[in-house]
From Swiss-Prot:
List of residues that carry Phosphothreonine: T264
SS bond list: C118-C195
Protein name per Swiss-Prot or TrEMBL: Alpha-1B adrenergic receptor
Function comment: This alpha-adrenergic receptor mediates its action by association with G proteins that activate a phosphatidylinositol-calcium second messenger system. Its effect is mediated by G(q) and G(11) proteins. Nuclear ADRA1A-ADRA1B heterooligomers regulate phenylephrine (PE)-stimulated ERK signaling in cardiac myocytes.
Keyword Nucleotide-binding (UniProt): no
Membrane topology: Multi-pass membrane protein
Subunit structure: Homo- and heterooligomer. Heterooligomerizes with ADRA1B homooligomers in cardiac myocytes. Interacts with CAVIN4.
Lipid-attached positions, S-palmitoyl cysteine: C365
Native organism: Homo sapiens
Lineage of producing organism: Eukaryota, Metazoa, Chordata, Craniata, Vertebrata
Signal peptide start and end residues: none
Domain of life: Eukaryota
SMART domains associated with the record: 7TM_GPCR_Srsx
Length: 520
């Protein structure tokens, strides 16, 4: 797609892929011959080559990172991300097979690889651009289903259906791009140093509609509907949550004077019936789908901003010579469309924390499988280690867990940052007898306890407390949960849960506080 195209003849072909014809000319209506070549400006060639080379390299590396992020992280292997990978593959193919030759044509000013390769190169250009926008069209439909039917989405959009949709994208792209290779084009020019896509009017109209304008209309309609549904659903879910919260009589923190057994029974009954659970599930799933729709909306918006100027300027310049933009402006518009290929790898980590973490792991050469082996070893050794220090101010329950799920070489205690949770102060009688050193509870290999509960004995009336000071201050049991497949890091893998029931030096006080790894 060389912007130095002679558009003196009236044609409806918006030759929007590949370098356009008459690339090696010095005036608007001059064409070169086999014996005349433009003189190469070395300084300009080096500067333009470095800029375009850096751009192409960034596009290649960025799209490879997107593909590896989904391939190496099981929790990212969702139907939506399959469409993102397909988009990255189209951009990567464009960066490998089209952009280097477009840059060479821009630097040299003429085509050097012959007529046959010119036709193949132009067809691949059409193929990649069409696959990109059809992938965005499939993404917009997927996001509408995800927002409109958030609870039914896993059954409506399965992995098999997503793969079939991706195959359809490439089949349609091939049908649109293969026409010139089968003879649907105007006669080839005599000069092999001229290279461009066909300007045959019917093919130009067919390719323009099928590759850009019809998919663009579908994308805009889908995202308008996504916005309307998201706005209405958000209002309904928020109203439902507020209503359930006003009708609910459950309290997370209960202050009462009943004994520990009665309160435990009431807590168990409360867990069995939660009127807000269905609303919470709907709100969580919908918010997740809406966030994904926002990220992909940015991708679609940038695609339109990059390609729309080109698809407006080129047809108008081809049909009406007076509306043709200056060569410098047209070159900027032309490369702006190609620039879209390196934008998506920037958008994903900036809009998605999951992609950002995946990019960091890949760039840091961190093996995902090695992290899973470490977590399995941690679970075999007991999961989490707790330390109770009764004579600190207010007392504290300290939890030691590595943020990267790592164990020290000795296999005794888990390494990592210390997390503290306020607990109860010990009784004066306990301190008066001379308190023992802090109890260090470490994850030894022989621990095989199936449950977890850290609790203090039920508070006694003030008159009888002194008789029971010789009893244990608390009891401890350990729990490890199986790793949920497809989760990342330590936020929900394995993990530990504990309920701390503390006396706090006051009779009748109780606090239930669940602990989850990474949530303090």
């Amino acid at each position: 797609m060389n912007p130095d195209l002679d558009t003196g003849h009236n044609t409806s072909a918006p030759a929007h892929w590949g370098e356009l014809k008459n690339a090696n000319f010095t005036g608007p209506n001059q064409t070169s011959s086999n014996s005349t070549l433009p003189q190469l400006d070395i300084t300009r060639a080096i500067s333009v080559g470095l800029v375009l080379g850096a751009f192409i390299l960034f596009a290649i590396v960025g799209n490879i990172l997107v593909i590896l992020s989904v391939a190496c992280n099981r929790h990212l292997r969702t139907p939506t991300n399959y469409f993102i990978v397909n988009l990255a593959m189209a951009d990567l193919l464009l960066s490998f097979t089209v952009l280097p030759f477009s840059a060479a044509l821009e630097v040299l000013g003429y085509w050097v690889l012959g007529r046959i390769f010119c036709d193949i190169w132009a067809a691949v250009d059409v193929l990649c651009c069409t696959a990109s926008i059809l992938s965005l069209c499939a993404i917009s439909i997927d996001r509408y289903i995800g927002v409109r039917y958030s609870l039914q989405y896993p059954t409506l959009v399965t992995r098999r259906k997503a793969i079939l949709a991706l195959l359809s994208v490439w089949v349609l792209s091939t049908v649109i791009s293969i026409g010139p290779l089968l003879g649907w084009k105007e006669p080839a020019p005599n000069d092999d140093k001229e290279c461009g896509v066909t300007e045959e009017p019917f093919y130009a109209l067919f390719s323009s509609l099928g590759s850009f304008y019809i998919p663009l209309a579908v994308i805009l309609v889908m995202y308008c509907r996504v916005y309307i549904v998201a706005k209405r659903t958000t209002k309904n879910l928020e109203a439902g949550v507020m209503k359930e919260m006003s009708n609910s009589k459950e309290l997370t923190l209960r202050i009462h004077s009943k004994n520990f057994h009665e309160d435990t029974l009431s807590s168990t009954k409360a867990k069995g019936h939660n009127p807000r659970s269905s609303i919470a599930v709907k709100l969580f799933k919908f918010s997740r789908e809406k966030k994904a729709a926002k990220t992909l909306g940015i991708v679609v918006g940038m695609f339109i901003l990059c390609w729309l100027p080109f698809f407006i300027a080129l047809p108008l310049g081809s049909l009406f010579s007076t509306l043709k933009p200056p060569d410098a402006v047209f070159k900027v518009v032309f490369w702006l469309g190609y620039f879209n290929s390196c934008l998506n790898p920037i958008i994903y980590p900036c809009s998605s924390k999951e992609f950002k973490r995946a990019f960091v792991r890949i760039l840091g050469c961190q093996c995902r499988g090695r992290g899973r082996r470490r977590r399995r070893r941690r679970r075999r050794l007991g999961g989490c280690a707790y330390t109770y220090r009764p004579w600190t101010r207010g007392g504290s329950l300290e939890r030691s867990q590595s943020r990267k799920d790592s164990l020290d070489d000795s296999g005794s205690c888990l390494s990592g940052s210390q997390r503290t949770l306020p607990s109860a102060s010990p009784s004066p009688g306990y301190l008066g007898r001379g308190a023992p050193p802090p109890v260090e509870l470490c994850a030894f290999p022989e621990w095989k306890a199936p449950g977890a509960l850290l609790s203090l004995p039920a508070p006694e009336p003030p008159g009888r407390r002194g008789r029971h000071d010789s009893g244990p201050l608390f009891t401890f049991k350990l729990l490890t949960e199986p790793e949920s497949p497809g989760t990342d890091g330590g936020a929900s893998n394995g993990g530990c849960e504990a309920a701390a029931d503390v006396a706090n030096g006051q009779p009748g006080f109780k606090s239930n506080m669940p602990l989850a790894p990474g949530q303090f």
